[in-house]
């Protein structure tokens, strides 16, 4: 399946629009990762534990989006947008939402 942030796919004609599809993931950040990120914040640098959590959540959201596109008979998703939001009282949950337009291309 082709997935792209652009509104068209070069060299491909859109034959049918199937509608908007979404993939959502809410991921909790555990205490160990939170402590490691605190040290990184204090000493400077990148938090590999949070980055890994973010990457995994994004990949899962895109996979869910593709599965939903397949379910409506699409073979591509165009105009993909990915949004991130921190949730929970302590900001210990991450929501990743991927959205796009499911289409059938030639």
From Swiss-Prot:
Q: Name one Pfam family in it.
A: YbjQ_1
Under the heading InterPro entries, the entry gives: UPF0145_dom_sf, UPF0145_YbjQ-like
Q: Name the coiled-coil region(s).
A: none
Belongs to which family? Answer: Belongs to the UPF0145 family.
State the name under which the record lists this protein. UPF0145 protein CKL_2433
Instruction: Tell me the organism.
Output: Clostridium kluyveri (strain ATCC 8527 / DSM 555 / NBRC 12016 / NCIMB 10680 / K1)
